[in-house]
Amino acid sequence: MLTSERSYLRYPKNRRWTEAGRFWAPHPENVLFIHKPTMEETRRVALGLRSQLVRNRERKTKAHLLSLELDRLVQVHDSRVRVINADIDAVKQMIGNMTWSDNIDMPQSRSHEPPLVTSPPQASHRNFTVAIVPGDPHFSVDRDLRGELMPTLYMNQNQWLPSFGPWFISLTDNAMQRRVFPKELKGTVNFQNSTSLKLISHTLTTVASTTADFFADARHLTDTQAALCLVNAYFCQKTSRQLPATPDDLLADLPQKLDLLITQLKQESGPGDFSFTYSNPQERASLAPLNKESRYPTAFFQRHKLHAMMAKAGLFPHNKGTGAPGTAPAMDLVFAITSAMFGSDIPPFSAYQWNLRAGIVALEVFILAYGLLEFGQVARGHPNRRLNLVSLLGPKFQPGALPDPNAPMLKRGQLFSFISEHYIIPTLQANPNAPVSFIFPGIILAALEARSTVSHKQPGPFVNLTGSRFNEIFEILNQQLTFRDPLALLQARTALRLATEEGLDVLLSHPSPPTLLQEIIKSQFGGGDDYDRAYFMVLGCLPVVLAVV
């Protein structure tokens, strides 16, 4: 091999750049220059164009959706107009087919005769009559027995004033000492061991509306209606009676239905009490289930004896795992009653548990009311009696209506049967939406007082001097008359209702609930016998005459 050939193989020849290679090759003269103002202006124009395109697209989308909604409204309106026109045509056809008689002489109006009033006054249809105790006179009521009775007690303020017992005296003193309290409720008579008419009226109104619904919902029943559905379903399940067919059937034989329920409840020996179980602290901020659900958590009713007894009887067949084998009815009795009485808008209690909770709490109030007067007697001239209607009502009280001293003893449950027939039924017939707190405000007050003493574990009697037991009531009055904050008012009413539920649990969990009730009524409200207890249960207070010094 030649020397030149070896050099060629060992050292390749240097390649030369092509025209394209020379263009892209690095060179000090190749400089990239960016003009910042031009780029900013380009960016601004591009963003403006993009925003305009987005707005145009959004405007077209909204216009399209609006046109669809308008088309739907036109279709709905057109269908409704067709229905209305069809009804009008049917009415016209019926009127055209009617036969008119020319022999009827229409009375001619005379100018000298006044026109006849063919309809009674508007308020007369609300007037009804109630009675509390056998032998006492009946009371003609327009709307509210308490609201119409209280003003009559303040007719002679220069001679005497009503006093309502230690609980109301303590409430009045505590209200006068509060820095924030509605001025219109601070009457001059508050400093004379009495309570002003405005303060006692607002307090009783607040207590009477404790269990009333905060808002309207087509699925809601009042707590009284829910309780009546529950007790009737349980009674029909245990006795194989026919389901109630009319609203009057719901109220018929109410003492017998409550007696059966209480008898079965006393036989329940399992663990538990009458409280609801809160697994989340936020559940106490609202009565409705959290997260807009229709059911409470599984453990919410777990400890409640009344719910457990009804579930064991098979009243809630939609709840899995409840009810003894072979005890469940062929259908949901509670749902059958609500559908027949209140329409198809009311869902089953097991599916929409707001009504279940409200009904159980109202049923607890009915149980306490029945137990308090189960063996009640109203003999004339009891030495420890506080209420004296003769001194309170004066000439309005008919002397001939006084109870007969030779009247026979009342049988077991007869006093509550009288109240059921002459007070509960007329009240619910006149006001079907009345909550149970409106019917028995005295039980609500006793429950609130029982709750305030539950934390005091004393071996003997004691006097509660703290003002914390009035906080829920005062907060509602402040929000209604002073601050007027709807959200705060809702929270205050929720707190009062929760406090009532806790107080009912304290009363029913006591070894002898009627005995504890009697002690509270006697020590805090002055009730000395069954006559006083019956009136306190209905009025929420026991006024007596107090001379003005």
Curated annotation (Swiss-Prot):
One of its GO terms (cellular component) is host cell. It is found in: Virion; Host nucleus. GO terms for biological process: symbiont entry into host cell; viral genome packaging; viral penetration into host nucleus. Residues 1-54 are annotated as: Interaction with major capsid protein/MCP. The keyword Transferase does not apply. InterPro entries: Herpes_UL25. Its main location: virion. Keywords: Capsid protein, Host nucleus, Host-virus interaction, Viral genome packaging, Viral penetration into host nucleus, Viral release from host cell, Virion, Virus entry into host cell. Belongs to the herpesviridae CVC2 protein family. Capsid vertex-specific component that plays a role during viral DNA encapsidation, assuring correct genome cleavage and presumably stabilizing capsids that contain full-length viral genomes. Participates in the interaction between the capsid and the tegument through interaction with the large tegument protein/LTP. Heterodimerizes with CVC1. Interacts with major capsid protein/MCP and triplex capsid protein 1/TRX1 at the pentamer vertices. Interacts with the large tegument protein/LTP. This is Capsid vertex component 2.
